[in-house]
C-alpha cells in the first residue's frame, strides 16, 4: 500500500503543537481594518487553536508532519 501524501495546502496553514493540537493564523486579518475596532484588531494578532472537533480530520491531511 502506498504512503499517505501530506496535503501541502494544509501543511502551509497549520502547525502541530506538542500536545497534539493544531494552531493557525487568525482569519479576517488581510484587509478592511477600518471597520474593526482597536480591540478586534488586537485580538486578531498571533495564532488560534483549532477546535477539537476538526483536529482528527486535519491530522489525516498532515499525516507525515
UniProtKB/Swiss-Prot annotation:
Keywords: Ribonucleoprotein, Ribosomal protein. One of its GO terms (cellular component) is cytosolic large ribosomal subunit. Residues 1-51 are annotated as: Disordered. InterPro entries: Ribosomal_bL35 (IPR001706), Ribosomal_bL35-like (IPR021137), Ribosomal_bL35_CS (IPR018265), Ribosomal_bL35_sf (IPR037229). One of its GO terms (biological process) is translation. GO terms for molecular function: structural constituent of ribosome. This is Large ribosomal subunit protein bL35. It comes from Pediococcus pentosaceus (strain ATCC 25745 / CCUG 21536 / LMG 10740 / 183-1w).
Amino acid at each position: 500500500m502506498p504512503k499517505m501524501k501530506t496535503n501541502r495546502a494544509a501543511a502551509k496553514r497549520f502547525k502541530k503543537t506538542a500536545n497534539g493540537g493544531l494552531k493557525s493564523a487568525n482569519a479576517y486579518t488581510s484587509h478592511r481594518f477600518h471597520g474593526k475596532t482597536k480591540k478586534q484588531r488586537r485580538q486578531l494578532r498571533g495564532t488560534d487553536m483549532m477546535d477539537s472537533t476538526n483536529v482528527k480530520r486535519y491530522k489525516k491531511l498532515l499525516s507525515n508532519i
